[in-house]
Amino acid sequence: MNELSKIEQAIEDLRNGKLIIVADDADREAEGDLVGLSEFVTPEKVNFMTKYGRGLICVPITEERALELDLHAMATNNTDTYGTQFTVSVDYYTNSTGISTADRADTIRALAEPLSKAADFKRPGHMFPLIAKNAGVLERRGHTEAAVDLARLSNSIPSAYICEILNDDGTMARYPALETLAKDWDLTLITVEDLVQYREKEIAIEN
């Protein structure tokens, strides 16, 4: 399967509610994230992320959505190496403690729900929204933008949930470990570079 076919497979998997793995560039973080569409989140999938991903679960959203929910940047002066745009953390108002997989799934789903309002979220909380650049991976080659781009390509609400993948010893999982994990978990593995090429080809066809 070539790289562009892998993107098509990833989109199909996401539409069917599956998780996928997205790896970024080797000269960037060189990390892999589990990615799912917020529309199809379940407590079981969140539990899979916490058990096997082991990283921080975040919720990529659009800048427009962040404004709608009054989600301001966590830091006014962002000094993160790669400019990851965290907002203040939140919990959905129906949550108990906010940390159970059911509570976190509810918050992820609510962040994507068009009818949700800013007042529906308690701040701070246990979920971390991330604001994606408007042009997606063509503007910033991060997992945040890749996740939102994939949601759009899947004709879903432009919101996803992601989690970095760590090895058993707590170090970051990189190639070839990511390939092994994708095979073990029966998940499609793509790269941000694959997605950039897919989007560039899509734009070229449109023009």
From Swiss-Prot:
The keyword Zinc is assigned to this record: no
Q: Give the multimer and partner information.
A: Homodimer.
The residues listed in the UniProt record as binding D-ribulose 5-phosphate, with positions renumbered to this chain, are: 28-29, 33, 140-144, 164
Name under which the protein is recorded = 3,4-dihydroxy-2-butanone 4-phosphate synthase
- Pathway it belongs to? Cofactor biosynthesis; riboflavin biosynthesis; 2-hydroxy-3-oxobutyl phosphate from D-ribulose 5-phosphate: step 1/1
One example of the protein's molecular function in GO is:
3,4-dihydroxy-2-butanone-4-phosphate synthase activity
Q: What class of enzyme is it?
A: lyase
Question: Matching HAMAP family, A to Z?
Answer: RibB
Reactions catalysed according to its record: D-ribulose 5-phosphate = (2S)-2-hydroxy-3-oxobutyl phosphate + formate + H(+)
Domain of life, per UniProt, equals Bacteria
**Residues annotated as site: Essential for catalytic activity:** 126, 164
Q: Which organism is it from?
A: Oceanobacillus iheyensis (strain DSM 14371 / CIP 107618 / JCM 11309 / KCTC 3954 / HTE831)
